[in-house]
Amino acid sequence: MKPDAANYDPRPEYLAELIGSTGLSQPALGRLLGVTDKSIRNWLSGRNPFPYTVQFALECLVLSV
């Protein structure tokens, strides 16, 4: 799987789906990604956009790539 920002889906609902697919808690996911719980909450609420790099990392994790 190669990164392609053209596949970026900025919807918080998509992020929530990816997070749910990992089976990880938000704190565990934050530690894995090197971000705070607050960042994840802000992304999920739509307050702040999440970066494509986060989407790609989660997609790789879900697909076990």
Predicted regions and their residues:
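Short, charged recognition helix plus adjacent turn
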Residues: 1-2, 42, 48, 65
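A short, Lys/Arg-rich alpha-helix, primarily the initiator
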Residues: 1-21
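Recognition helices and adjacent regulatory flanks at domain boundaries
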Residues: 4-6, 23-26, 56-57
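Key DNA-contacting residues within the recognition helix of helix-turn-helix
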Residues: 16, 30, 41-42, 59
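Residue-level detection of the helix-turn-helix DNA-binding "recognition helix"
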Residues: 20, 34, 45-47
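Short alpha-helical DNA-recognition segment
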Residues: 23-41
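Amphipathic, hydrophobic secondary-structure cores in small proteins
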Residues: 38-45, 53
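DNA major-groove recognition helix of helix-turn-helix/homeodomain DNA-binding modules
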Residues: 52-65
